[in-house]
Amino acid sequence: MKFVLLFGVLLVTLFSYSSAEMLDDFDQADEDELLSLIEKEEARAKECTPRFYDCSHDRNSCCRSELFKDVCTCFYPEGGDNEVCTCQQPKHLKYMEKAVDKAKKFGGKIKKWFG
């Protein structure tokens, strides 16, 4: 019985050590991947197309606003055959950003009152 108990404790110890090593490896891989994604996003942010500028060359190059990414919207001007594309923010996202800003301001006032 002592042998089985000793073997069980040894097995649990080895298993916990190996799982801790695997978790450390996964954490390091996730951290490296996250850093590379952040670097790519920063590089892309420098090349983005500002709001109301032409985005016909790359329809996914629109800049981000505070919360949401602008959308490349294409249309045909009246009396013209050429398609015009510009980066624009959809109205519903604009209203959502305004609501979030007002909620932040209200939260700041509450902190002043009770904080």
UniProtKB/Swiss-Prot annotation:
Keyword Aminoacyl-tRNA synthetase: no
Keywords: Disulfide bond, Knottin, Secreted, Signal, Toxin
Location(s) in or outside the cell: Secreted
Principal cellular location given in the protein's record: secreted
Pfam families: Toxin_35 (PF10530)
Annotated disulfide bonds: C48-C63, C55-C72, C62-C87, C74-C85
InterPro entries, per the entry: Spider_toxin_CSTX_knottin (IPR019553), Spider_toxin_CSTX_Knottin_CS (IPR011142)
Top-rank lineage group of the source organism: Eukaryota
Signal peptide feature range: 1-20
Any one GO MF annotation of this record: toxin activity
Propeptide: 21-44
Tissue: Expressed by the venom gland.
Database matches in PROSITE patterns: SPIDER_CSTX
Record-level GO cellular component terms: extracellular region
Family: Belongs to the neurotoxin 19 (CSTX) family. 01 subfamily.
Domain topic, free-text comment: The presence of a 'disulfide through disulfide knot' structurally defines this protein as a knottin.
Protein name as it appears in the record: U3-lycotoxin-Ls1f
Organism expressing this protein natively: Lycosa singoriensis (Wolf spider)
